[in-house]
Amino acid sequence: ACRYAVHELNGFPPWFPRLFEGHPDIVSEFVLSEIKQEVASEIPGTESHYLLSDVSSSGQWAWDQLAPALLKLLLEHNLTNAFNLGKLLRIVQGSTSVTDDDLILLAGQKMKSADTIEFVAIWYAVWVGVEPEKAISALTGHLSSISSAMEQTEFAMTFVTQLSAGRGSEPTRVRQAYVTPRHLKKLFLLMHTYIREDEDI
C-alpha cells in the first residue's frame, strides 16, 4: 500500500493519511527509507520530484513523526542538492517535534562545512529564525568579511530569499523569532547596505 501511494501523481491518495494515522511507525519507516535513498542518490542542481517533494508539499500530517529522523539525517550528511535541503528543512522547521535548540545546533554545525554562497545563506536563515540576536550579529560580521562587493550583494539577496520566500514554489518554513520590530529593523538596514536598488531583482 505504501509503495502504491508514493507513486501517485500530484501528492498522495486521500486514504494515505488515514493509513499513516492507523500505522504511523510502519508508514514512517517506509517513508524514511525512501527519502534516505532519494538523498543518497541526489544529483546537485537536479530536482528529483519523488517522495521528498510530496512529503514537503502535502504531507504535513506526517511532519512531526518524521522530523526527528530527518534532523538526524541532516546532522550526519552534507547535502549537495539545494532542492533536497530546502525540502528537508521545510519539514524539520515546520514540525513541532524539532526544537529551536535543535535548529541552532544544526545551523551552527552546517555553517562550518558549507562551501557555497547559497548553502551558507540557507544556514544563516535557519539560525536567524530561531536565535536572531546572535545570528544577525554573526551575519553582519560574515557579510563584512566578504571581500567582493558583488559577492556581498549575492549573499545578501540569497539570504533574504531563504529567510522569506524559500526556493522554488514552496514557501519557507523558517521560524519567526526574528519577526520583531527590533530585529526586522536590523535586518532591513543590513540588507540595505549590501543590496543596491539597481541590483535588486
Where are these regions (language model features)?
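Non-catalytic all-alpha helical scaffold/repeat segments
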Residues: 1-201
